[in-house]
C-alpha cells in the first residue's frame, strides 16, 4: 500500500543532461533534500566514474542514497524503491521537500507505479543460476526459453543479467517472472509530484557527454578503474558495466592506449544517453518535458511549473 509523502519533485533525464545541477538548485531554493535515483551512483567505489555529486555539492544540501552499497552487492529496483520511499517520508516529516533525481527510469516506475510482488530469491539459488548462466554464455537464452518462454521473447540473448533474473525467479518461486509481472502493482508513495524530464538538444548533450568524460579522467577515473580492477568483480554485475569502465580497464591491461580508451568511453556514454532518451520519451510520457539546456532561464521555467502545482513553500 502506498504511503503519502505530501509533495515531491522528481527529475529524470539522460546522462549528462544537467539533472544533478538542477536538483541542487531546486533543493537550495525550495528547502529540499536530494534522493538518488541513479543505479550506478549507489556504488561507493565509483564517485568519479558515475558522476556522483562532489563532496562540496553534497555539503550544500543533504543527499541520500549515494554511495550506499558495494559494487559487489547491487540493489534491485524494488529494494531501491523501498529505501527511497523511506527517505522521502523522513524528509517530508522534517518539513522539507524530497527532490528525487536520476536517469534510471525503472527506479521511478518502481517508486510511483510499483513493481510485481516477487518474493525474495534465496542467495544459493541466485548464485547457482548466475554461475550456470555464466558458463552457458550464448546458450543462456535457451535456458530462459525453457523456464519462461514469454519473457525470453522480450529479452536479447546478450542480456545475461535479465536472463539470469528470469531463470532464478522461475526456479525459486515455481512461477515464471512473466506471470508475476501480470499482477497489478501498487506504488510505494503517493502525493503531489512535479515530474520533470530533461531532454536537451541531442548535439548539445553528446558534446557534453564528451566533455564530461574528459573531466572524469582529470578527476581520477583511471584511478577508480584501477581500484575496480583490483576487486576482481564478476563482469556480469551491474557495477562492472559502468560507462567507460571497461575501456579504462583494457588500457590498464595494456590492450589499448588511453586515447583509445577515452574515445571508447565517450562512445559508450553517447550511445547510452541516446537509449535513455528513447526509453524516457516512450515510457514516461506523462512527465513534463523541458528541451532547453540547463540554465538560469530553465530553472525559472521549472520553478514556475512547480509553483503551478502548489509545491513551493509558503
Swiss-Prot record:
Protein name: tRNA dimethylallyltransferase
EC number: 2.5.1.75
Cofactor list: Mg(2+)
Stored Gene3D superfamilies: 1.10.20.140, P-loop containing nucleotide triphosphate hydrolases (3.40.50.300)
A Pfam family annotated for this UniProt entry: IPPT
Alphabetized InterPro entries for the sequence: Dimethylallyltransferase, IPT, P-loop_NTPase
A GO molecular-function descriptor: ATP binding
Species in which this protein is naturally found: Parvibaculum lavamentivorans (strain DS-1 / DSM 13023 / NCIMB 13966)
Protein family according to the UniProt entry: Belongs to the IPP transferase family.
Region of interest (Interaction with substrate tRNA), ranges: 38-41, 161-165
Keyword check for tRNA processing: yes
HAMAP family (alphabetical): IPP_trans (MF_00185)
Catalytic activity: adenosine(37) in tRNA + dimethylallyl diphosphate = N(6)-dimethylallyladenosine(37) in tRNA + diphosphate
